[in-house]
């Protein structure tokens, strides 16, 4: 709702009183659709939908997969009567997920809300319960007869009334269906101390918020053909990575290789089968699959009998497999090349059969009797390979985004849970074996170790190592990350991030580049600079990710609608038939693809087929592909159809629909009319007005950029005569075949780039820089920052919404939680203190609170328990009985060891006092006396900080031990060296601050807050920075927000006109006067408000110097780092400079005296540091040489002494001789 004022007048007469319900919509109206989308979906729907799918369906599927454990106990036949065989069976049924709970140390279980989990460092997780049935069967074992088991006992587990058994805890994603916040109203959220702007989509593990980053991978089950580079004997290869739809992420790869380079004779084709050592000629595989005659094999590969080129290419292959003419021999041929050696022929044949059934193209099926399907699929792969080899088709593009999948929380957790559940069932089975062998009673409580699943999931989410703890090295790292809470937009952006797990140091540029197919799905600007550039991406605003639906209904539908099954397909009888694929499996062929496609589309638009399913008809290749799998990135588009009344293509969405959407929105905001039927995004989807398109389907449609592009060309021609200079120039379209239309082109941007005003007027890397810096800007990250105890938080005192806004900010809540202030900026050279990206700031504005911020840091500690009796205690340590106390003052602590809120603290003051008891027999490095009974374990404030204690939280952790968090607050005032940035990648630090009387002023007496240097503009081409300033000036004068959205009709000309109307120079220049002399400045100064952000790099957090201080234990050199009061490293390059200068004494002083000078005595005879020196008696002796006189004292770095001694330990003897000892 851009303009409530305009819509109000409609509401007075009639809610639907728009001009004409069937009138075409304008670009403005599409924002109503976008609002509807975000009102229903939110910005993290991809995370939530994925997790909900996991809990609702996947979890149960995994349990059903290994649902039954069977243990047979055969009769031992030790005595006559011992002829009874037993069979024990445990089966898992339905799984139940509770609401999040916590088990306290005293045994009480109660509901756990997210805020409590954050404050007490708990895990926000639900219990998993499963129905377990136990059955026992018996049979009388008569030799030579099959066992006939009779059920003798069946029991459900009765520890709870319903027979549910606890198997572990599942961390719950906030705002998902299982979370308490999902149905909470705004007032409930305030009661729970949650911020209504918090969007969920993350987990709370041990009190810290964790996001699962979407992991990008290549899609399975698709055939791809690649050319091989010259040295390889293989010219082309077709490969498919088969992954089972459901079930383990078990992947088997099949490669079909074309040997021989172009022009060489005998170019045979061979395939690499799993578990088979050599490549097998394809004809042999066909024969092993039961397709014997040559003609039939060729027909499986080449669908056109008259295609002599392809048949010619297949000639060598037929000759290659000529020796083998029946199925048995072919299977034996494959079996011989297997991994199992020295087995009989029958076994070998069975082995080959098993491989072809289970390992060869397992995604088609793993059952037997589907040889013909697999043969056709293999033929299809060879066909694709030959098409590429004959240059009729290009090789596949590895970086095509439609051939990629993103694994979100659902698939990631499923993969992990499957592994853990397998481990759990294995443990249960072992326990069953033990109880049966030792004839104990079977106790379900002991059998199920619930910790397996609980700690397995918690470990993966806490560390980000995705996989089992034992295999930490092989698993992926960084899958789960701590949620970035620096500013609201950085949080949103983090929840929409994707990662490509390729080695970061790979020199390959291709995977990092922006690909055409990323359009509208991935933000083109927001990616990190440096080693992860292009590998870490962010989703565009309207992107969603499919959660995966069951393909069975579609397959059934296809069969009913005239798809001939693959088994009955005879290529030469129907040469024009279209191949039908569902999720990469070739199911059959169809004679009338156009009509089938039409039907499928209609069904999808009605909602009978899930809207996220994608359907692609490739007319040239005669293929129809349908994808229902999870992880495809898709986005919504308007549907364009032929309009009979108008006689040209027109959007299906009309003004009437927009009116209904706006009425519903008005209803939500104002509580408007009673009789408004709810009309939401789903209504648009179900009425077939918009549809979801993924990257693969996008290849087969034609998209118009704006609704206006659909107007027929004739209509525009008469308007071309009087061109308004203030209008943007439109591209003229002569296409009439549009099938879809963009909802709005600015939706190609992601979260961070949507905040930039006029990004379409900037050089592209500048938008990338701002996307990174916008995440470091201070603002208000959430409205409940006062009740949260984050490790660090920065809050701007007076955040303002920007004067130049973009329409997308409405959905990013940037007006509600902004991160910056509108500073009055002059672009001028003044005094020279703003060179090289520094700027001059007005000290008087700073004194009034410009860019001031609060900084919070929390310190956490808990009483740990060692063994049964020894526990740490919070108290004020006393010097008399406590060892190893810190240097800081303990005076500010109360007697309970905690500091009171409101106390001013400075560096190294102790803020949490804690002691550990020492056992009486322990020896403490000679400091210990009889009185000392405790050791200090207190927490001091960071040495470089100071502030005021803001809040102290005392509670207990899950084990019932005392647990405290102390939050310290500091005010950070802008000073020289602090970093600021506009929203265009124009960052700079303060070079100097002048009071207002020293600043230049305009004729109206306005003084700028900031002066930036004009040299920052031309080479960087951030024109938008200037346009923003101009627009903000108009906005400030007129009192409206300026719309700086990209790809709109706003032009500099138009803004200048408005500024002129307000009585200012149209291009934003003003006459200014020198603040020191009062004289007019020679030049006109570009002057106006611009939105600036305060970034988190502040000089007070970086300043560092040291004279003497702590040394490392091993090398006795200064320690490293500001936090440890470390030294400044004089490194190799600095050393080289000093050598080049010839400054030898300075070099020695830096590298030795100022670091680790050390004195040793060496023996003049053996040259070793073996001298025993009694300095107070002035006696020296080298025992080995019996030498008391020829002894030298030398000064060398301690690190050098250490090196010599380490070399001695390796049996290398460095001997040190002085000039004098050589003369001796």
Curated annotation (Swiss-Prot):
The modification Phosphoserine is found at residue 919. One of its GO terms (cellular component) is cytoplasmic stress granule. The keyword Oxidoreductase does not apply. Keywords: DNA-directed RNA polymerase, Magnesium, Metal-binding, Nucleotidyltransferase, Nucleus, Phosphoprotein, Transcription, Transferase, Zinc, Zinc-finger. GO terms for molecular function: DNA binding; DNA-directed RNA polymerase activity; mRNA binding; ribonucleoside binding; zinc ion binding. Mg(2+) binds at residue 837. Its EC number is 2.7.7.6. It catalyses: RNA(n) + a ribonucleoside 5'-triphosphate = RNA(n+1) + diphosphate. GO terms for biological process: RNA-templated transcription; transcription by RNA polymerase II; transcription elongation by RNA polymerase II; transcription initiation at RNA polymerase II promoter. It is an enzyme of class 2 (transferase). It is found in: Nucleus. A zinc finger (C4-type) spans 1163-1185. InterPro entries: DNA-dir_RNA_pol_su2, DNA-dir_RNAP_su2_dom, DNA-dir_RNAP_su2_hyb_sf, RNA_pol_bsu_CS, RNA_pol_bsu_protrusion, RNA_pol_Rpb2_2, RNA_pol_Rpb2_2_sf, RNA_pol_Rpb2_3. Residues 467-478 are annotated as: Fork loop 1. Zn(2+) binds at residues 1163, 1166, 1182, 1185. DNA-dependent RNA polymerase catalyzes the transcription of DNA into RNA using the four ribonucleoside triphosphates as substrates. Second largest component of RNA polymerases II which synthesizes mRNA precursors and many functional non-coding RNAs. Proposed to contribute to the polymerase catalytic activity and forms the polymerase active center together with the largest subunit. Pol II is the central component of the basal RNA polymerase II transcription machinery. The binding of ribonucleoside triphosphate to the RNA polymerase II transcribing complex probably involves a two-step mechanism. The initial binding seems to occur at the entry (E) site and involves a magnesium ion coordinated by three conserved aspartate residues of the two largest RNA Pol II subunits. Present with 18700 molecules/cell in log phase SD medium. Component of the RNA polymerase II (Pol II) complex consisting of 12 subunits. Belongs to the RNA polymerase beta chain family. This is DNA-directed RNA polymerase II subunit RPB2. It comes from Saccharomyces cerevisiae (strain ATCC 204508 / S288c) (Baker's yeast). The gene is RPB2.
